[in-house]
């Protein structure tokens, strides 16, 4: 049975027609919001986090129907299959077991392997952090450069930045991902070879961007005076292809393993997170894993009606497939969470930006929305104008950290006030009558410009304090939300074939850019013209 023929889907279509013009402002009016209030009914806790869903365009009936749809779409079955290690990534014939990386269950068949690799990471990190691990001149390591792209970059970078207040001040962590040489060159200006450790992260150890940067960094070390025989003191590798790592020149004992049952965008919990362990230490990394595991257990055991990942996922489907929203915004009111939106872009869109169902048919409904965002309050001075008064409705996740991780505590009430006020303003709007009072009798022409439609939906996620544990829970919440939505859409959330075609053609174009002659019939006229212009520029 296809998604749009499920009974709950059809009931939701009818229900949407009944409430699409309802106003959040009216639902929150005191006469319409007796105890238990909307805020009380629609605020849930789990995994150490709280989520206020009350400013969404939902009723109790909406949630009942969304949960019914989740059940009819077999969300529980697929969730349990993932945790059991079944092949839930059929196009690649793989299990999906990032949750095993943070599980505390010693009966898991992967427990021993995971614990052994984690112990190896911890021992290595302790050596680097203590100064026992030194470079080729005997100096301690003061710079760690993580070279990777996609999941080998976005997750670790986001976590290291978020938990900088927990990081050792002795070591600076740098991230290089882009094949644009400017990215690596920027970092080279900040480091010196005697005190630098490079972590090369690639599942295959053949990724174009990663290996281009790794080779350039290795050449830089040699040019700066590091003997080739001493390079092993400055390079470690993380890969599922250890033979290729050794071929690159990294010592076997400096190879950390990742597994094909962990997808790149779910891999920060593995050896891919080695830069995290070095930055914040093994104990804090364990806390990160523990927080994620706490959310895993909530996802596995909480009834769907009180299950945070399920409700987040289903409310997202409500806007995407019934309201027709094309994008959704993540606005963390925390500078520490600066890279959360870019991390979630990959997690959400690479996972669920799919057109093919699991059975090979094509979807007849929308899948992943465009995910975007920027920390508050910066975003208020950039794109919130559109959110408040534009004709397009963009659902928003606000993420608020209730206690600051820094000593400038007087700033924090202002930050939180802006977050909560934005959610209230987006919900309430400003009516014509209210606008007329603001404009006054002498400025009637201003009224249309200062009216706000309101009724803009938001969810506010509350984090008591930004700790390694709470961050782990927050990340896992979004991971499981992705599974919920992918299951309902009947797509494979764990492959990424969409990145392959461009890679293949990229190799052809790269060869043409540097070849002595080019067969212009190989490409369309536009691509051929672009190549010709680039060839001319590269010869200057």
UniProtKB/Swiss-Prot annotation:
Q: What GO terms fall under cellular component here?
A: cytosol
Q: Which family does it belong to?
A: Belongs to the GPI family.
Instruction: Give the species.
Output: Paraburkholderia phymatum (strain DSM 17167 / CIP 108236 / LMG 21445 / STM815) (Burkholderia phymatum)
- Enzyme Commission designation: 5.3.1.9
Keyword Cytoplasm among record annotations: yes
Catalyses:
alpha-D-glucose 6-phosphate = beta-D-fructose 6-phosphate
Name the GO terms of the biological process aspect: gluconeogenesis; glucose 6-phosphate metabolic process; glycolytic process
Q: What is this protein called?
A: Glucose-6-phosphate isomerase
- The active site of this protein is located at 350 (proton donor), 381, 503
- CDD domains from the UniProt entry: SIS_PGI_1, SIS_PGI_2
Matching entries from PANTHER family are given as: GLUCOSE-6-PHOSPHATE ISOMERASE (PTHR11469:SF1)
Q: What is its main location?
A: cytoplasm
Cellular localization per UniProt: Cytoplasm
Entry's InterPro entries?
A: G6P_Isomerase, G6P_Isomerase_C, Phosphoglucose_isomerase_CS, SIS_dom_sf, SIS_PGI_1, SIS_PGI_2
Which keywords belong to this entry?
A: Cytoplasm, Gluconeogenesis, Glycolysis, Isomerase
Q: What is the lineage of its organism?
A: Bacteria, Pseudomonadati, Pseudomonadota, Betaproteobacteria, Burkholderiales
Q: Briefly state the protein's biological role.
A: Catalyzes the reversible isomerization of glucose-6-phosphate to fructose-6-phosphate.
Q: Which domain of life is it from?
A: Bacteria
Which EC class heads this enzyme's classification? isomerase
Extract the GO molecular function terms from the UniProt entry: carbohydrate derivative binding; glucose-6-phosphate isomerase activity; monosaccharide binding
Gene symbol here is pgi
Its pathway, per UniProt, is: Carbohydrate biosynthesis; gluconeogenesis; Carbohydrate degradation; glycolysis; D-glyceraldehyde 3-phosphate and glycerone phosphate from D-glucose: step 2/4
């Amino acid at each position: 049975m296809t998604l749009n023929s499920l009974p709950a889907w059809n009931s939701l279509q009818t229900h949407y027609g009944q409430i699409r013009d309802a106003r959040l402002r009216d639902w929150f009016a005191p006469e319409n919001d007796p105890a238990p209030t909307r805020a009380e009914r629609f605020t849930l806790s789990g995994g150490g986090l709280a989520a206020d869903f009350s400013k969404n365009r939902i009723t109790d009936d909406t949630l009942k129907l969304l949960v019914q749809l989740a059940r009819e779409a077999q969300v529980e079955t697929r969730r349990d299959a993932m945790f059991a290690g079944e092949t839930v990534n059929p196009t690649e014939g793989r299990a999906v077991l990032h949750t095993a990386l943070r599980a505390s269950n010693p009966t898991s068949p992967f427990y021993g392997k995971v614990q052994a690799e984690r112990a190896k990471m911890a021992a290595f990190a302790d050596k680097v952090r203590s100064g026992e691990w030194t470079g080729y001149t005997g100096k301690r390591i003061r710079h760690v450069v993580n070279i990777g792209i996609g999941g080998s970059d976005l997750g670790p970078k986001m976590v290291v930045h978020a938990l900088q207040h927990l990081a050792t001040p002795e070591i600076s962590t740098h991230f290089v991902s882009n094949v644009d040489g400017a990215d690596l060159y920027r970092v080279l200006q900040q480091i010196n070879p005697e005190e630098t450790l490079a972590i090369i992260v690639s599942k295959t150890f053949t990724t174009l961007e990663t290996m281009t940067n790794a080779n350039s960094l290795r050449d830089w070390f040699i040019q700066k005076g590091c003997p080739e025989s001493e390079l092993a003191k400055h390079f470690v590798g993380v890969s599922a292809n250890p033979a290729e790592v050794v071929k690159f020149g990294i010592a076997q004992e400096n190879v950390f393993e990742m597994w094909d049952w962990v997808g790149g965008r779910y891999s920060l919990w593995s050896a891919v997170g080695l830069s995290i362990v070095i930055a914040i230490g093994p104990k804090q990394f364990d806390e990160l894993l523990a927080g994620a595991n706490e959310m895993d257990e909530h996802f596995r055991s909480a009834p769907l009606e009180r299950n945070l990942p399920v409700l987040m996922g289903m409310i997202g489907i409500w806007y995407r497939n019934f309201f027709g929203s094309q994008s959704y915004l993540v606005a963390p009111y925390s500078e520490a969470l600066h890279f959360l939106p870019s991390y979630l872009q990959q997690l959400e869109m690479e996972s669920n930006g799919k057109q093919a169902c699991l059975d090979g048919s094509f979807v007849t409904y929308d899948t992943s929305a465009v995910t975007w965002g920027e920390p508050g309050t910066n975003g208020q001075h950039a794109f919130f104008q559109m959110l408040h008064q534009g004709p397009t409705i963009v659902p928003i996740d606000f993420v608020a950290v209730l206690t600051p991780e820094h000593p400038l505590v007087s700033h924090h009430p202002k930050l939180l006030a802006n977050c909560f006020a934005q959610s209230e303003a987006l919900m309430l709007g400003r009516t014509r009558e209210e606008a007329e009072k603001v404009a006054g009798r002498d400025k009637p022409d201003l009224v249309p410009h200062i009216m706000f439609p309101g009724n803009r939906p938001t969810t506010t996620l509350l984090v008591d304090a930004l700790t390694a544990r709470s961050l782990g829970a927050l990340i896992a919440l979004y991971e499981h939300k992705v599974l919920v939505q992918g299951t309902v859409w009947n797509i494979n959330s764990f492959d990424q074939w969409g990145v392959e075609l461009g890679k293949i053609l990229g190799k052809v174009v790269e060869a043409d850019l540097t070849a002595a002659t080019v067969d212009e019939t190989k490409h369309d006229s536009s691509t051929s013209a672009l190549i010709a212009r680039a060839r001319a520029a590269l010869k200057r």
